[in-house]
Design a protein with these regions (language model features):
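Short internal beta-strands
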Residues: 31-38, 220-224, 357-360, 382-392
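Beta-strand->loop->alpha-helix junctions that form or flank phosphate-binding loops
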Residues: 36-37, 55-60, 99-103, 144-146, ...
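Phosphate-binding loop of NTP-binding sites
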Residues: 25-31, 62-68, 79-224, 228-237, ...
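Nucleotide phosphate-binding/pyrophosphate-handling subdomain across enzymes
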Residues: 2-8, 18, 25, 29, ...
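Conserved hydrophobic helix-helix packing surfaces used for dimerization/oligomerization
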Residues: 8-9, 75, 115, 141, ...
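C-terminal helical cap/extension that packs against the catalytic core
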Residues: 50, 376-434
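N-terminal leader/targeting and accessory segments in enzymes
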Residues: 1-100, 104, 219, 249, ...
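Short acidic/histidine-rich motifs immediately flanking catalytic phosphotransfer sites
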Residues: 68-74, 162-163, 432-434
Length: 458
């Protein structure tokens, strides 16, 4: 189906971070947009306020009439929705055009120059940073992001004239195989989603296949430390990057008084005195990748420097809520061992002499089963670890798999505790916290406003 000729778009799973970006895009393109989601959330309420009706029961009668025309309505669904879903079955039985979110993004990468960011971790921050640099430059861009940009208060950017589209490329369910990138960054390939891939080798092969999809004339920008071996086509350039080595890297790094600056080293043009608007150590490396992609597509040194300085970050990605001499509170979406490790290293680098406490809600039983020892090693960099029950998301419980697996593997010197998430506010109220980080991709983040209010009165 030609996206230019559809009149209505119906979303099954409209409240997902990636799905909602597409919903907003089609609304701005003048299409009738509606959808279903399992539960109301702040994001679904925002969509409703913006003019997108959403309901929360599997009810065919609730589907607007404009979305029941098989000739003019496109149905987009998330892989998390089961085939038994009543509304999905309704559309399938009647022969509607039904696509996954990634298929629609793939179509956009055929009509635009797709600047994609893939990787186990770092892709949301890197893609949002790149989109901000590009959008503020003379080039501009469209963007579909995996988080809410704090610069724009939304998860997408729409341009009236740019041929570029920045996309966070999701490896879950091999979704990124639908894309045809003009250029792509690959930040990391630490195995994840083994419930889908089965083995580390299959996971790495999926990324290898992704590199075959880069368009001729484009480029691969790949982290120096990856096990995965790329398989690029003819006329595709390859560049490497990291914090301190590769074709693109940072030098003269300065971390002091809550500020971070560095010199950007590039085969195109070095850019001295880059200041991070969100001063987090991990954003040095993310920033190098974002600047590399933006520079390769025409951004000037001044535009790179200005974009980095004004970048405010992404909600739930090293997201500071309180930052003063008495308390530091931040939330972070980290839910893979390597993400936890990067967050722990960054916060330790920023607050070397302060007590750091993490409250962590593991995400998925399979991920906890596969990586509990790795989680424990990463969390053991901190002084105190409070573990909540596993957030199941799409999964059923697995016998013997609980947060205690991580708890039992924590280093001897780490103070530790197991609590229910509902008890977190009381725990914060009754304990002294110096630097407190809320970790995980589940619903523990819903308690952050309450935790913030408690700490502000202490």
């Amino acid at each position: 189906m030609d996206l230019q000729h559809i009149k209505a778009v119906y979303f099954i799973g409209a409240g997902g971070i990636g799905m909602s970006a597409l919903a907003r895009y089609f609304l701005h393109m003048g299409r009738v947009v509606a959808g279903y989601d399992k539960t109301p959330t702040p994001l679904t309420r925002e969509l409703v306020q913006e003019g997108i009706p959403i309901h929360y029961d599997e009810d065919v009668e609730a589907i607007p009439e404009a979305c029941k025309d098989v000739q003019s309505c496109l149905v987009i669904y998330t892989p998390a929705v089961p085939e038994t879903h009543k509304e999905l079955a309704f559309f399938r039985q009647r022969g509607f055009e039904i696509q996954k979110r990634a298929q629609v993004l793939g179509t956009l990468t055929r009509s635009h120059k797709g600047l994609c960011v893939a990787g186990t971790h770092g892709k949301t921050s890197t893609s949002t940073m790149c989109a901000h640099i590009m959008h503020e430059s003379h080039i501009d861009c469209n963007a579909f992001l995996g988080g809410i940009s704090k610069n724009y208060g939304t998860n997408y950017i729409l341009s009236s004239h740019s041929d570029y589209v920045v996309i966070e490329a999701d490896e879950y369910d091999r979704s990124f195989h639908w894309l045809r990138p003009w250029m792509t960054v690959i930040t990391a390939t630490d195995p994840d989603h083994l419930d889908i891939y089965g083995t580390k080798e299959a996971y790495l092969e999926s990324f290898r296949h992704y590199t075959t999809l880069i368009q001729p004339g484009g480029a691969l920008i790949i982290h120096t430390d990856l096990e995965m071996k790329a398989n690029i086509g003819a006329n595709v350039r390859t560049f490497t990057y990291s914090r301190d080595a590769g074709d693109f890297y940072a030098e003269n790094i300065k971390i002091a008084d809550g500020e971070i600056s560095f010199d950007f080293v590039s085969p195109l043009e070095n850019v001295p005195e880059v200041v991070l608007g969100q001063p987090v150590p991990i954003n040095i490396e993310n920033g190098v990748a974002a600047m590399a992609m933006a520079q390769l597509n025409g951004c000037t040194a001044d535009e790179l420097r200005a974009g980095m300085k004004t970048y405010l970050g992404v909600e739930r990605r090293f997201d500071f809520q309180i930052r003063n001499n008495r308390h530091v509170l931040l939330s972070d979406y980290a839910h893979h061992p390597q993400e936890i490790l990067q967050s722990a290293k960054s916060i330790r680098e920023l607050y070397r002499d302060r007590k750091i406490t993490a409250i962590f809600q593991p995400h998925l039983y399979t991920r906890t089963r596969d990586f509990y020892a790795d989680f424990a090693r990463a969390l053991s960099l901190l002084d105190e670890v409070i573990l909540c029950d596993i957030y199941p998301a799409r999964e059923q419980p697995i016998h013997g798999v609980t947060s205690r697996l991580i708890y039992d593997q924590l280093a001897p010197g780490v103070k530790k505790e197991l609590i229910h998430k509902e008890d977190v506010p009381d725990w914060v109220r009754n304990h002294d916290s110096d630097v407190l980080i809320i970790l995980g991709a589940g619903d523990l983040n819903d308690y952050v406003p309450q935790i913030k209010a408690i700490l502000e009165t202490k």
